[in-house]
Every structure is written in C-alpha cells, then in structure tokens.
Amino acid sequence: MQFFIDTANIDEIKQAIDWGILDGVTTNPTLAAKTGRPFMDVVKDILSIVDGPVSLETVSLDTEGMVKEGRFLAELGDNVVVKIPMTKEGMKAVNILEEEGIPTNVTLIFSPMQALIAAKAGASYVSPFIGRLDDISTDGMNLVRDIRTIFDNYGYETEIIAASIRHPIHVLEAAKAGADIATIPFNVLEALFRHPLTDIGIDKFLKDWEKVPNKPF
C-alpha cells in the first residue's frame, strides 16, 4: 500500500519524507487556504521536494474550465495529477485530459457506480471519501471494498485512493479492503507510529542499558 499525505503544509511533507514512508501528496483548495500563502508558492514548494504523484485540484465546474486549469497545472511538473470532481462535466474533462496523457484523480466519490463511471472515463485514480460517509452513519469502508471488487472483476487499472481518513483504524481497514493508496492527514500519519507497548519496551531497554558496565556509547 502506498501512503500519500493529505496536506499543503511544507513542514509536514518534509517530515513525512524524512521518515521514508511518503509516496505522494494530495491537496485541495481548503488545505491550500490553511497555509495562508499564495497558491502558486505552495505548489512550487511541494513539487520541489516531492518525487511522487502530487494531486492538485481544479476549481471550475464546467468542462472547458477544468480542462484549461488541468493543462495549466500539468505544466507545473511531470508528477502532477489533476483532481477533478465527480460530475458529468468532470468526466468529460477526465476523458480529454487522460487522452492528452495528463493523469487525473476523480475526487468526491461516494458510491461504487461513481467510481465505475470514473474508471470507464479513463481516470488514473478515484478517491472514495471514507470519513464523510462515516459521518452520516454509513460504513465508508464498504465503499472501498465494493470498488475493489468491481475493478478486479473487469480489470480496471484505475487506482483506489482511500481519502477522508480520520484515524489509524481507517488506514488499517483500507489496507485490508485492498485500497492501493491511503491519503492521510499528518496527525493520523504520526499516530500510526505509536503503541503504548512500544513506549514501555523502549523505556525498559533504556533502564536496563544503564546497568551495563563499560558501555561503548
């Protein structure tokens, strides 16, 4: 499973890179706004340090606008993936951009049929939003399982990005359900490292080490 980080915060991205576990980045207008910096400055900084896929979102709602913005974003780097919303106009844009060799990530997926439509339109990625479904008392992980089954049944190469991740259990369940990628907020990514027994074990090792005579370091 690949780990993307869902952020536009450069410091968070750098830390994830240093941990050696980062495969890519996803952003959106909300995350970009949280930085308080000009959008293009944020994007250029991200692309300067990330080798893997970086999803950048269009903001137009019509096909022409999405295609225009998608082409602009794609020119910023070879690893740019254009995020397109799951709409009829969006699927037209996906078809055009993918035909031009520009990879797309269809976002705001909430049903298996939406994912199937995106795959048929040629999307490189689909992003089912797990947490938002959980928020309305629907099991979001069932969506990932259904998409995985459908894609496997028909040989679609579109990759599944489990999105709207809220806690470590979401990551675990997405991995078990067969998601290709989980895009994870920084706080959840940090939480994946932690376990109380690990902390207890480290503390015991250090205390025992203090008893060792003539330590080399």
From Swiss-Prot:
Top-level enzyme category: transferase
Keywords in alphabetical order: Cytoplasm, Pentose shunt, Schiff base, Transferase
A single Gene Ontology CC term: cytoplasm
Example GO molecular function: aldehyde-lyase activity
InterPro entries assigned: Aldolase_TIM (IPR013785), TAL/FSA (IPR001585), Transaldolase_3B (IPR022999), Transaldolase_3B/F6P_aldolase (IPR004731), TSA/FSA_arc/bac (IPR033919)
Location within or outside the cell: Cytoplasm
Known catalytic reactions: D-sedoheptulose 7-phosphate + D-glyceraldehyde 3-phosphate = D-erythrose 4-phosphate + beta-D-fructose 6-phosphate
Associated pathway: Carbohydrate degradation; pentose phosphate pathway; D-glyceraldehyde 3-phosphate and beta-D-fructose 6-phosphate from D-ribose 5-phosphate and D-xylulose 5-phosphate (non-oxidative stage): step 2/3
A biological process term (GO) from this entry: pentose-phosphate shunt
EC number: 2.2.1.2
Catalytic residues of the enzyme: K83
HAMAP family attached to this UniProt entry: Transaldolase_3b (MF_00494)
Family assignment from sequence similarity: Belongs to the transaldolase family. Type 3B subfamily.
Stated role: Transaldolase is important for the balance of metabolites in the pentose-phosphate pathway.
PANTHER family per record: FRUCTOSE-6-PHOSPHATE ALDOLASE 1-RELATED, TRANSALDOLASE
Protein name per Swiss-Prot or TrEMBL: Probable transaldolase
Species lineage: Bacteria, Pseudomonadati, Aquificota, Aquificia, Aquificales
